[in-house]
């Protein structure tokens, strides 16, 4: 990218931008919620569209001069609908959390009961955590994973639904490595007369590539981010049935947000177009292939995977048998250039600031070009770094850099 002007006008920030590029280039990015956006997406984010205020929706703005950005938003909405087979799309949410909030405000009243996945079992803050707005404004009841299989037990979900009679059931997760059966969730919702919202932020790319069953035919509302497996800009997306469109849209604007970020909406449109290309399906297939292989290689080295494997882009590693916490593993591996995040595991005994596990994803490294054969080396570096954590780690840092040199970023 061309940084001619910022390098001249603000060298302090420019230096940090270059430093971050160096960090990304020389490190292996395994955070499951991160990816590498294309230069086309980034060009849209840095475009002249950032100058335009456009409160409202296409054809009904509160500012003049919106006829160009109206076209941008229309394209983004139509591409999102085409990509996921949805009746309606709202591309204005600034984040996934705001997308979830908008759905809640569309169909819930303060204090209504909602059934969502427990954060410590793989859910998300906005699925009812008591420290989040969702847990403060609504009466969330949590479901988790089975103690033995570490997968969702739909019979237990049904029992909880019948007992608590939630107005809404939230399906979806931030750290769950198995296929989610949206049809079963729909059946449970129909049995008790509840709405179904699916948060597919993590698996949106897999859904687009038809590598995970789509929630769209079953859910009343589907929310997502656009920057994880979709490889787009940081932002949110909501899909819904047409009958909810009007109420949903007014809960985004004027309910929660003012002016939409038109440069980000343009970048969303670009990423939707990229995801509609046949090459995107090939990319997502490689993401899953790499994740499965990395998981298998870690198991060979004595690591315990939650649910014993993966069906998607991430694995959750239980470190209880490795005599190291998630917090310490995250810090240790960062020292050699491998970035991942500490994560709670089912039946967690440690605090969320320490944790007994780590979450690993392969979306970003697959975008860079990492192949299945590289997963053995990554697993080996992770294992040996943890084993030899009290020794000099320079050799592992060099091995990471050698791998990264094979797959340059933005070159």
From Swiss-Prot:
Residues reported to bind (6S)-5,6,7,8-tetrahydrofolate: 119, 123-125, 351-353
Names of required cofactors: pyridoxal 5'-phosphate
Catalysed transformations (reactions): (6R)-5,10-methylene-5,6,7,8-tetrahydrofolate + glycine + H2O = (6S)-5,6,7,8-tetrahydrofolate + L-serine
Metabolic or biological pathway, per its Swiss-Prot or TrEMBL entry: One-carbon metabolism; tetrahydrofolate interconversion; Amino-acid biosynthesis; glycine biosynthesis; glycine from L-serine: step 1/1
GO molecular function terms listed in the Swiss-Prot or TrEMBL record: glycine hydroxymethyltransferase activity; pyridoxal phosphate binding
Subunit structure: Homodimer.
The protein's name: Serine hydroxymethyltransferase
Gene name linked to the record: glyA
